[in-house]
């Protein structure tokens, strides 16, 4: 009877660990999708944020070192993470002529 209880506790612990892991993975995917949407929005709002070809090739080579199986489509997303260290700048056109209440509700 005692061994049955121990085995049941071990199974329950493994189920809880898997549930916590699944929750963590879901959170990571959710946060990644939010970041991807923000990066796309920033590149549309701020067209001056561009990466020249030399810098792009350098970033791709760095990515290959850490993850050789990384596909080309993921490289711009990784490069965009650098923009998230600080909040995006407020475009000059949106900061002129608005009162305090409108700027609080804005995206920036």
From Swiss-Prot:
Q: Where is this region: Disordered?
A: 81-108
Residue ranges with Acidic residues bias: 97-108
Q: Which domain of life is it from?
A: Eukaryota
Induction and repression of expression: By the zinc-responsive transcription factor ZAP1.
What is the name listed in the Swiss-Prot or TrEMBL entry for this protein?
A: Uncharacterized protein YOL131W
Look up and give the organism this protein is from: Saccharomyces cerevisiae (strain ATCC 204508 / S288c) (Baker's yeast)
């Amino acid at each position: 009877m005692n061994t049955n209880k121990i085995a049941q506790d071990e199974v329950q612990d493994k189920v809880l660990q898997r549930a916590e892991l699944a929750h963590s993975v879901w959170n990571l995917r959710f946060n990644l999708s939010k970041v991807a949407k923000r990066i796309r929005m920033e590149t549309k709002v701020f067209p001056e944020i561009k990466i020249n070809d030399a810098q792009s090739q350098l970033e791709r080579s760095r990515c290959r070192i850490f993850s050789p199986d990384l596909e080309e489509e993921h490289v711009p997303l990784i490069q965009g993470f650098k923009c998230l260290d600080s909040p995006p700048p407020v475009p000059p056109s949106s900061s002129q002529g608005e009162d305090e209440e409108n700027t609080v509700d804005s995206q920036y």
